[in-house]
Amino acid sequence: MAAKDVVFGGEARARMVEGVNILANAVKVTLGPKGRNVVLERSFGAPTVTKDGVSVAKEIELKDKLQNMGAQLVKEVASKTSDNAGDGTTTATVLAQAIVREGFKYVAAGINPMDLKRGIDKAVTALVEELKKASKPTTTSKEIAQVGSISANSDETIGKLIADAMDKVGKEGVITVEDGKSLDSELDVVEGMQFDRGYLSPYFINNPEKQSALLDNPFVLLFDKKISNIRDLLPTLEQVAKAGRPLLIIAEEVEGEALATLVVNTIRGILKVVAVKAPGFGDRRKAMLEDIAILTGGKVIAEEVGLTLEKVTLADLGQAKRIEVGKENTIIIDGSGAAADIEARVKQVRVQIEEATSDYDREKLQERVAKLAGGVAVIKVGAATEVEMKEKKARVEDALHATRAAVEEGVVAGGGVALLRAKQAVGDKVKGDNADQDAGIKLVLKAIEAPLREIVNNAGGEASVVVNAVLAGKGNYGFNAANDTYGDMLELGILDPTKVTRTALQNAASVASLLLTTEAMVADAPKEEAGAGGGMPDMGGMGGMGGMGM
């Protein structure tokens, strides 16, 4: 086992804070409407230019082991926030840095770190409550567009595209982001359905970049039982192979010899097949298979209606224009089902929604309507160069997550204002059990100004002046860094999803507390560089060459 370095107390924390600062300083330059770009090196091809906090954080690995530990913990804040809320990664990183920086001073002054942590937790709980109280539901398409624009770094066209997409497929509809073919971004709505089952074997993948299997113009076989014997499938496979088209098999389970044979045929390129499990369970599974059958114009092969696998003809199979199968999702795009049949099915499910007694059943039925009627909206991102396209696509994906979060939990005033108002509302209400906990509460209430300060710094303003001006105002009064003016943030359309602000604060405090309560760090000791092999004598004698009378 390699030797380890163990570092204690103040020295350990100081090295860790250096790492936190390096990562946070690189991430926070992207915050706000006047945030800058960060260029990331790629091992091949052009560098990536981004204004997305989590993309920057993910790239950072530091040489110093102890600094790197601090940086990796803050990276966790960014990626956790990205996973939960889809946006707010830069805000979370800035908050984490501020809490660590303030907290570090207190710990150095001899305050108990565990009590400090308890104080931080109390303050965060109170602030989250205030954020929830201040939250306002998003109802209009305009508000959704505003949330999207802010998240896409003040790009109004992106916000509008997302709002249009949500209008067309409904708030429960499926929205995907793809590379466009032209300079402008555009919205494409495709009839389709998504369900939460992915491929049964990774060997079905034919698009390694997206880690998915794409089938163009495939047949769809729907079977309500397990398939383990390949002989049952052979008649269908032979007919599909003759037609020269791919096949998607949706069954309760495909296992053993049947799955192995399908995989081998796919790898050898004899037949393009993908197998997935049927979505749902029990009666719901039957209903969803029936939905897919109606959407694709096929039949569910079930013994109770007198159909068996051996007797299947191509007429019994559904068809679609394209099917994408990922690790956890399958999207059927442009099924061949008759519009009248789909409409009748939607009506039937809507009647069931009215009769449903439990909220859970109602929610599941509404999901089915969204899948049958909603379709899939595809946002095609256009740009002049591939580098710009990647950067823009990342922003569109961020904005999409933010708008979903806004629909879920509502919105608060953006630009760091909601946090300041929550701070004012909490004021002196929250008390710790002792002076050390009070210090933790005070620390969070000071650190919470950091996002607004950073937005102002990036816009070239004087942070303290702006923070005091905003604190002097009331309600949604805040600072618009895009044009250096003050006003009502909601009226100006500067909104943040409550979920994003809340998640950023909670994750930042959680990781910052861990850093502050650290007392020792263990890392691999740096390897000693061995000297030149073979014990060569030193060349000191060469210095006398000056006297050779040259």
From Swiss-Prot:
Record keywords: ATP-binding, Chaperone, Cytoplasm, Isomerase, Nucleotide-binding
GO cellular component terms listed in the entry, alphabetical order: cytoplasm
Lineage: superkingdom: Bacteria
Residue numbers binding ATP: 30-33, 51, 87-91, 415, 480-482, 496
Subcellular location: Cytoplasm
EC number(s) on file: 5.6.1.7
InterPro entries given in the database record: Chaperonin_Cpn60_CS, Cpn60/GroEL, Cpn60/GroEL/TCP-1, GroEL-like_apical_dom_sf, GROEL-like_equatorial_sf, TCP-1-like_intermed_sf
Main location class: cytoplasm
Gene Ontology molecular-function annotations: ATP binding; ATP-dependent protein folding chaperone; isomerase activity; unfolded protein binding
Entry's Gene Ontology BP terms: protein refolding
Catalytic function, reaction form: ATP + H2O + a folded polypeptide = ADP + phosphate + an unfolded polypeptide
PANTHER family, per database record: 60 KDA HEAT SHOCK PROTEIN, MITOCHONDRIAL
Family: Belongs to the chaperonin (HSP60) family.
Subunit structure: Forms a cylinder of 14 subunits composed of two heptameric rings stacked back-to-back. Interacts with the co-chaperonin GroES.
Role this protein plays: Together with its co-chaperonin GroES, plays an essential role in assisting protein folding. The GroEL-GroES system forms a nano-cage that allows encapsulation of the non-native substrate proteins and provides a physical environment optimized to promote and accelerate protein folding.
Name listed for the protein in its UniProt record: Chaperonin GroEL
Record organism: Variovorax paradoxus (strain S110)
Biological classification of the source: Bacteria, Pseudomonadati, Pseudomonadota, Betaproteobacteria, Burkholderiales
